[in-house]
Every structure is written in structure tokens, then in C-alpha cells.
Amino acid sequence: PGFGFSVAVMTIVARSLGQGKPDRAERFTKITAGLAFVAMSLMGGIFFLFAESLTRLFIAEPQVVYWGSLCVMVAAFEQPTLALAYVFAGALRGAGDTRWPMYVTILGVWIFRMPLVYICVHVWQFGIVSVWVVTALDFLLRSLILWRRFAGGGWK
């Protein structure tokens, strides 16, 4: 759903700005962010509550189900921030500010996530769950940066 909200807000922002209505673009972005946050928080709740059942849909080996369930539980917590990162990136893209979402994605994946995952797994030996924790932190970081860029209003 996050990607769908991103595409929807991108279209609404582009159309609103094309009509000379930046306040409308801002209002609909905030509404879309709220809807996406709620929808993906609910999905996260489902992930968390049914982590083991969801994991068992793909594999039955007990140890893999155990570790997979833990990863799904962590993924549950990244859903709200993933929603916000997608929505604010979409809003900025719709406004023609395409570089910031690209820069933030590069920063998040290649400067933050990959090195930290490497350190967590190979240096600190935290294991597979740490990969998911770092990914959740990456989306939190991205959502905060993109929200700040959007809130700054320079895209108007």
C-alpha cells in the first residue's frame, strides 16, 4: 500500500501545483500521510500478531519459522515509517523535487544501512534480526529527512 499512496500523492501534488494551488497539495499530502500511516500501522499490527502464521505460509522448519517470525515482527514496526517515507518522497517528486528522494534513498541504503548491517552481522555478530532492525531504522531516518524537506516548503 505504501507505494500506492506514494503514486497517488505524487499525482495529486503535481496536479494541484499545476493548477496553482500549493496549499491544496500540502493539505492532501498531510491527509495521504495520515491515511498511509494508519493503513500500514494496521498492516504492521497484523504482521506482529500473526508473524508465526505468516512465516509458516512459506516454510515449516521450526528454526527457520522462529527466526523468520522475529524478522516479521521487526518488519511490523517499520511499516508506519515506510509509509511516511514513501508519501513524502512521492509528494516531493510530484512537486518536481526529484533529487532529494534520490539522495535520501542513496544515503539511507548505501551510507547508513549497508555499512551498519555489515557491522552488525560481521563485527558485532548480532545475527539476522539486526538486519531487519537496521532496515527499520533506515526507513525512520528517511521518513524524518523527507518530512523535514517537505515541511520546509521549498517545493512550493
What does each of the following model-derived ranges do?
Residues 51, 57, 65-66, 109-143, ...:
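Membrane-interface helix-loop junctions in multi-pass transport and translocation proteins
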Residues 8, 52-61, 91, 95-98, ...:
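Transmembrane helix-loop junctions in multipass membrane proteins, especially transporters and channels
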Residues 1-51, 82-104:
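Small-residue-rich hydrophobic transmembrane alpha-helices
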Residues 1-2, 62-88, 107:
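Alpha-helical transmembrane segments of multi-pass membrane proteins
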Residues 27-38, 69-77, 103, 107, ...:
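Internal alpha-helical transmembrane segments of multi-pass membrane proteins, especially GPCRs
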Residues 9, 67, 76, 88, ...:
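Hydrophobic alpha-helical segments typical of transmembrane helices
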Residues 2-6, 18, 43, 117-120, ...:
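Alpha-helical transmembrane segments and their lipid-water interface positions
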Residues 18, 25, 54, 68, ...:
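Hydrophobic, well-ordered secondary-structure elements that form the walls
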